[in-house]
Amino acid sequence: TFTYESDRKVEKDDLYDLASLTKTTATLLAVMKLYDEGKFGLTDRISQYIPALKGTDKERVTIEELLLHQSGIPAFWPFYKETIDKDSYKGSFYRARPDASHHTQIDTRLYVIDKFDYRKELMAKTFSADYPLQVADSMFLHRSFRDSIMVQIGRIPLKDRRYRYSCLNFMLLKEMVENISKMPMNLFLDKEFYKPMEMNCTAYLPLRQFKKEEIVPTVKADYLRKGKVLQGYVHDESAAFMGGVSGNAGLFSTARDVAKVYQLLIDGGVYNGKRYLSRETCDLFLTHTSKISRRGLGFDKPDVNNSVKSPCAEEAPEEVIGHTGFTGTCAWADPKNHLVFVFLSNRIYPRPFDHKQLMRLNIRPRMQQVMYQALMK
């Protein structure tokens, strides 16, 4: 069903918030297409394609380092804090324990201020040319905020170049895609992949194309969206405050549509008889791996040396590529056995910290394990 309290059964065409599965189902696909066309090289500096990074400590970071999560860029940054009016509340915004002004629980040991406002110059209640970035119902960000995020990333101090999974890496890759293609990334993906592949249930900003009732709700009361149910708006804060189209999250889709992308990849760039990517590009991105982590070029992979830390079933071969998402999603493609495994859920409903059994019980790897065990019989 859609939720614990609902008797509405999930249909095969109902859309889920993919969360970080967006990275490989959207952003990486666009990156591979532009690489295929010779628009950049993996050792190119990202600052060649994002002028805002020139003169910062990110200037020498390469595209390959972003894809491998070895850029030195921090894992996360709370961009949304810049939009909050600090004069609208007293004391701290967060507290480890509830008190008279902190009743809203957002994590196991974290509570947020009950009442706060957004800066009026950055957030409006209605859409306009100056406020086009929709964050939720009756919440529209100023058009300048998206560009300010790139400036903020440029100012964040760079750390060492060890492996550090970071959503910011893929936010930068999305910016690169748009600067090279001269198109919004969602429209680029529609044109190059989603429309010709008949992925009719895949979209950024899904409420522009689908009814709310066709989209599975993600959380019941999001504190940054004034306690509203999130249904059709991306849950990830960074993607939300980019206006819903981001490189790290924002895509909504179905299991059937997601499977098409990974079938395309293990079939060497061909889907339903049409070529979308060269075999050489697919081979490179599917086989290139980091020397210091389990990661591939944008893809996550099994940890063959540590099954406890591996995101995949122990039986999954090292050739497997894919990704997971915070909302309870994953997709894994196995070119060796020619298998595609996709699992979508809204495991963070009603509150992200309430239902962690999907991770604690390793449900996703165990489901994948059943598939491999059946294959071995």
PLM features: residue spans?
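Short, surface-exposed loop or secondary-structure junction motifs
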Residues: 59-318
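Short, glycine/proline-biased beta-turn/loop segments that scaffold the active-site neighborhood
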Residues: 42-56, 196-197
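Hydrophobic (often cysteine-bearing) scaffold residues that line and stabilize catalytic clefts
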Residues: 18, 22, 27, 165, ...
